């Protein structure tokens, strides 16, 4: 059973950009040390992001990376795979929310180096507790194991929010009990962001 922290999924549209041009754009973006996630967090997107992280780490270790996030969230395990790899590399990571960072997307926005969590003015951030997907089946003992694992996952997410915001466990527990939506400014005041920005120059000067 997959553990997820996500908004409802939407259909993916095929890119209208010709493949050769899309490849050139992708290479130019990666060469500028920018990594994007613009869809759900799953095993596919996690694998792609991790490969890019290690490519940048191996080619120029220690040089800053900008991680741009516009995501409705997704699978917890896939999100933590990205989180752990970002913490392992030597390159400092800046996160920039543009559009939406919901659920696991909001967790990923917190993986930045200290003082490097940014968002654009019209971005939104949503936090909540992890969701179960699919039909729950099995023996009573199996369901008990799943429930315990879910609780451990929930507490782990709460601890990340606690460390990121400076709020206590009970305050975060209350905030994620239901979907909590925030504007960029509200997320800044809550402690999920370091700055709301209007230009890339503000990132470079911080």
From Swiss-Prot:
This is ATP-dependent Clp protease proteolytic subunit 1. Its EC number is 3.4.21.92. One of its GO terms (cellular component) is cytoplasm. PANTHER family: ATP-DEPENDENT CLP PROTEASE PROTEOLYTIC SUBUNIT, ATP-DEPENDENT CLP PROTEASE PROTEOLYTIC SUBUNIT, MITOCHONDRIAL. Its main location: cytoplasm. It holds the Pfam family CLP_protease. CDD domains: S14_ClpP_2 (cd07017). The keyword Protease applies.
């Amino acid at each position: 059973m997959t553990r997820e922290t996500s908004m409802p999924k939407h259909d993916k549209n095929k890119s209208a950009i010709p493949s050769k041009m899309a490849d050139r754009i992708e290479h130019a973006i990666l060469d500028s040390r920018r990594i994007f996630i613009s869809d759900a967090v799953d095993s596919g997107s996690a694998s792609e992001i991790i490969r890019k992280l290690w490519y940048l780490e191996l080619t120029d270790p220690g040089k800053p990376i900008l991680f741009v996030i516009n995501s409705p969230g997704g699978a917890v395990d896939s999100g933590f795979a990205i989180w752990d790899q970002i913490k392992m590399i030597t390159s400092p990571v800046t996160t920039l929310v543009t559009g939406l960072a919901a659920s696991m997307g909001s967790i990923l926005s917190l993986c930045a180096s200290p003082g490097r969590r940014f968002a654009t003015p019209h971005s939104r951030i949503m936090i909540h507790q992890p969701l179960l997907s699919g039909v729950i089946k099995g023996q009573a003992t199996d369901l008990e194991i799943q429930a315990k694992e879910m609780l451990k996952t929930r507490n782990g997410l709460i601890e990340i929010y606690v460390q990121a915001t400076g709020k206590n466990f009970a305050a975060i527990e209350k905030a994620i009990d239901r979907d909590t939506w925030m504007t960029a400014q509200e997320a800044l005041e809550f402690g999920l962001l370091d700055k709301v920005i209007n230009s890339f120059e503000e990132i470079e000067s911080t």
